[in-house]
């Protein structure tokens, strides 16, 4: 049965539903303990689009409230009661309710529950929409065609019936989900995430203020840095060309003469590009290529070189007769950069994560490991960094400013990673406030409203303390509890023991700053499941040196080594990663059944005989592919079993701190007074009136410390707080 609550007496007359008053609707719902909830709106932005309807329902009764004629505040007491409200993607609905000063207490978000059930599965493998889930559990097909027309049609008879239909299956879906939730012991995880979504909706609703003049000045500086970086690259290529390829008096080169003359038609004008080489010394031919064959080999190689530099021999009256060589590479095109870097001796071969095949790449990670190959590497990395800043942190941020609030309201994804970590980006704002550069120029652009202070608080060495706690490593625990707490110096001492020797940890930062800096990368790599190969690739050092560093690390931190071995064993035994023992979030090895099927064949010696034969004669056969896929996925899952547990604990303490903070603000009527501006994994940024910033700072630190306790049990984890006129950290 569908009921409509509307003050538009002459509109929406239909035999598909009955019209009732607000009072009658509240009377009908008075006995409901569990209420299915949904909204329909004019659009996605709570500040510029209207709330059209709010729907309440059970399996048998649905009530649609016409919010264009009925004040939704008449349902405030009902919505803020202790009833449980079931919804789907309640992050969206809560913001529209918050806009009307309505803050529900008890909610169950079916979409969050579904994501927790399938955490670890690749995006798209299991649909998370209400339509997909209703079909998966109930076998019903929800018609969503009306939803796409609401923005154009507004409230109509079809929209009212559609809105009622959206709340009808929610309780049946919840009942079906609970069987799986109980089987996976996810009850606490579901409850936890349902608490956090209320805070996350408030974060999105608050948004953050951007200092527009300062941002525009930053954009100009960023563009200037990019232009300088591009000029440095162009100058280097031309200089290299002159030194190695264009100097007829060079005595260090083989006397091989190769001439090219290219003609390029631009409109009615013909430009001639002449390249004259005496030789190209960096090219090393295979040892078997000598004499005349070397000349031929060199010519073939030089065909790759000449597009990088052009000379305008013809000129014109307007641009003059500048015959100086000019670099013609588009540095933003990897296709144009790769041939040059290959010619200079860089190894650009990597593996495509999607296709699992070899490919060539000039990504920063690859070039950074080969800084000693050529000076152009550092110049190109500078260019890449400057280019990313210009393209990612420019006009798009100004475009994201809401015309009503003057603030940026970013979109967040509560379970944006398999670790249950929060992620940001996309949506109406399409900017990522969690991935902003750390430089003071950028951070200073984020400011509070006039009369407010900005408050930043971040955990003290969060990851290192979590690792010490979960691994129960005595060296790390002793450092944090009884020592100076400088874990980077401790890692340097363990990894580079042959250099640092018996130097006290307190003195390493001053005496061995380079090794302490190197230790940060080693600590990050190993703590997240990396090995000697990871260190070798990240630092561009020989494997033997990387192995020595890795072995020293593991000897120095036996607790970490033991803990990682345990993680690796458990994941391939259970088929999932227990992310933490408190909430019992888990990330599945999505293809575990297939991997287990393959692994069971390994005990058969005949299988390996067949595998070796097929690998030699038919490497594309199913058996060879199965073995390769097994060990690739096993390696990835084992690394994740180490990495995910650490990241999840960090995410959980951040979420718990945020829940505690939100509840405090709500209890003390400070919602809207204290704004939650930016969450960044281990950092919380607020703004509040100056008169209360000292008090709120203390409350924030207390919430963060309390949030950390259940997930970092063997040592305290505090937070540093700063108060200022803009984002400080």
Regions found by a protein language model. Name each.
Residues 171, 217-255, 259, 553-569, ...:
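Polymerase palm active-site segment centered on the conserved acidic dipeptide of motif C
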Residues 12-14, 39-41, 49-50, 55-59, ...:
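Acidic, glycine-rich two-metal-ion catalytic cores of nucleic acid-processing enzymes
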Residues 117-119, 171, 202-226, 467, ...:
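Catalytic palm subdomain of template-directed nucleic-acid polymerases
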Residues 2-17, 45-182, 190-200, 488-496, ...:
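Active-site-proximal helix-loop-helix substrate-binding element of RNase H-like nuclease domains
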Residues 104-107, 143, 148-317, 328, ...:
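Mixed-charge, glycine-rich, non-catalytic linkers/tails in nucleic-acid processing enzymes
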Residues 1-39:
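N-terminal accessory regions of nucleic-acid-interacting proteins
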Residues 140, 162-175, 183-210, 259, ...:
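Core structural elements
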Residues 35-38, 107-108, 210, 454-458:
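Short hydrophobic beta-strand that contains or immediately precedes a catalytic carboxylate
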């Amino acid at each position: 049965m569908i009921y409509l609550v509307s003050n538009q007496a002459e509109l929406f007359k239909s035999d598909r539903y009955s019209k009732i008053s607000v009072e009658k609707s509240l009377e009908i719902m008075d006995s409901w303990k569990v209420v299915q909830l949904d909204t329909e709106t004019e659009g996605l932005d709570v500040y510029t689009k209207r709330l059209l309807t709010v729907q309440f329902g059970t399996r048998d009764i649905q009530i649609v409230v016409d919010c264009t004629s009925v004040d939704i505040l008449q349902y405030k007491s009902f919505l803020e009661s202790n009833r449980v409200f079931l919804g789907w993607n309640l992050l969206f609905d809560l913001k529209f309710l918050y806009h009307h000063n309505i803050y529900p207490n008890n909610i169950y978000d079916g979409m969050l529950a579904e994501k927790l059930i399938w955490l670890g599965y690749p995006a798209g493998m299991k649909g998370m929409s209400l339509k997909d889930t209703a079909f998966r559990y109930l076998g019903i097909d929800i018609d969503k065609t009306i939803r796409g027309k609401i923005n154009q049609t507004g409230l109509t008879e079809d929209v009212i019936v559609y809105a009622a239909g959206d709340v009808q299956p929610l309780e049946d879906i919840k009942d079906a989900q609970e069987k799986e939730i109980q089987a996976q012991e996810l009850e606490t995880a579901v409850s936890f995430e349902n608490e956090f979504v209320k805070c996350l909706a408030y974060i999105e609703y608050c948004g953050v203020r951007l200092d527009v003049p300062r941002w525009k000045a930053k954009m100009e500086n960023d563009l200037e840095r990019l232009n300088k970086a591009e000029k440095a690259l162009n100058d280097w290529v031309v200089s290299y060309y002159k030194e190695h390829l264009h100097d007829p008096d060079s005595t260090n080169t083989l006397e091989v003469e190769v001439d090219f003359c290219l003609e390029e038609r631009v409109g009615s004008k013909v430009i001639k590009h002449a390249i004259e080489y005496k030789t190209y010394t960096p090219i090393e031919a295979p040892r078997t290529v000598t004499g005349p064959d070397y000349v031929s080999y060199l010519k073939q190689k030089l065909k790759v070189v000449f597009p990088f530099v052009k000379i305008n021999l013809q000129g014109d009256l307007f641009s003059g007769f500048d015959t100086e060589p000019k670099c013609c590479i588009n540095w933003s095109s990897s296709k144009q950069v790769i041939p040059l870097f290959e010619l200079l001796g860089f190894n650009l071969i990597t593996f495509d994560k999607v296709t699992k095949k070899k490919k060539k790449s000039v990504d920063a990670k690859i070039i950074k490991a080969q800084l000693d190959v050529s000076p152009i590497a550092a110049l190109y990395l500078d260019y890449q960094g400057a280019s990313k800043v210009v393209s990612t942190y420019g006009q798009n941020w100004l475009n994201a400013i809401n015309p009503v609030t003057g603030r940026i309201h970013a979109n967040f994804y509560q379970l944006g990673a398999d670790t249950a970590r929060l992620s940001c980006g996309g949506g109406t704002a399409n900017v990522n406030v969690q991935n902003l550069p750390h430089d003071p120029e950028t951070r200073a652009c984020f400011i509070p409203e006039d009369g407010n202070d900005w408050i930043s608080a971040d955990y003290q060495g969060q990851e290192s303390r979590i690792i010490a706690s979960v691994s129960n490593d005595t060296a790390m625990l002793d450092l944090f509890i009884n020592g100076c707490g400088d874990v980077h110096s401790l890692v340097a001492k363990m990894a580079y023991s042959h250099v640092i020797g018996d130097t006290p940890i307190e003195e390493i930062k001053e005496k061995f700053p380079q090794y302490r800096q190197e230790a940060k990368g080693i600590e990050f790599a190993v703590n997240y499941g990396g090995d000697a190969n990871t260190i070798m690739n990240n630092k561009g050092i020989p494997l033997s040196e990387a192995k020595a560093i890795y072995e020293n690390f593991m000897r120095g931190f036996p607790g970490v080594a033991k803990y990682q071995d345990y993680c690796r064993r458990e994941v391939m035994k259970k088929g999932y990663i227990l992310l933490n023992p408190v909430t019992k979030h888990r990330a599945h090895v999505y293809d575990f059944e297939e991997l287990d099927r393959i692994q069971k064949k390994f005990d058969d010696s005949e299988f390996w005989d067949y595998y070796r034969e097929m690998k030699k004669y038919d490497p594309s056969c199913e058996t060879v592919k199965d073995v390769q896929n097994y060990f690739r996925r096993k390696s990835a899952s084992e690394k994740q079993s180490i990495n995910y547990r650490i990241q999840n604990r960090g995410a959980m303490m951040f979420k718990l701190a945020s829940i505690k903070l939100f509840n405090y603000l709500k209890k003390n009527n400070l919602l809207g007074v204290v704004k939650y501006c930016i969450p960044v994994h281990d950092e919380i940024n607020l703004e509040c009136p100056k008169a209360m910033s000292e008090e709120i700072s203390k409350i924030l630190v207390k919430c963060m410390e309390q949030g950390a306790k259940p997930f970092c049990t063997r040592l305290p984890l505090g937070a540093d707080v700063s108060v200022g006129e803009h984002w400080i950290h």
